[in-house]
Amino acid sequence: VSDLEKLAERAEQASGPRPELDATIWLNVVATPEQVKTVEAGRKAHGDTEARFRVERMMDGVRYTASLDAAMTLVPDGWHIDLRDYADSRAPLAGLKQMGVASVKQADLLAVVGSGETLALALAAAALRAHAALRDSGRQPQAENAAGG
C-alpha cells in the first residue's frame, strides 16, 4: 500500500478536520522539492516544532480536511468530480453517521472513490487515490518531492 493510499485511509477515518493530516497531504502532493528541503532543514536544525512551523507558514492556512474548496485543489488536472452527501435528518435516530462520498474520474475511465464524515474528507481521500493511481501507472513521477509516496 502506497503512502498516498495510507493518507487516503487516514482521511476516511478522520472524524473531522485534522491539521496534521493537512500538513502531511501538502508535503506529499503539493510541496515542491525546495519546500520539502526547507522543512527537512528546519527539522534537522531545530526539531519537529520548527518543521511544523515551516509547513504551516508555507501552506498559508490551507485546510484540505476542513474545506471542500481546498480539497478540490488536490484533484489532478483533467479529472472530474462527483460528490454525494448522505446527510439525513433520520441518520442519528438510526445510529448512522453523516457520510460524504466523492469520486474522481479521468477521461480514460480511471476512477477512484473516497468516503468520509464530511465531503472535504471524502474528496481529499479520493484525490489522494487519484494521485496514487497516476504514480502507479507511471503518468506522474513516483516522488515529485522528497516526501513523495
For the regions a language model picked out, list residue spans one by one.
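Glycine-rich anion-binding surface patch
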Residues: 1-121, 125-149
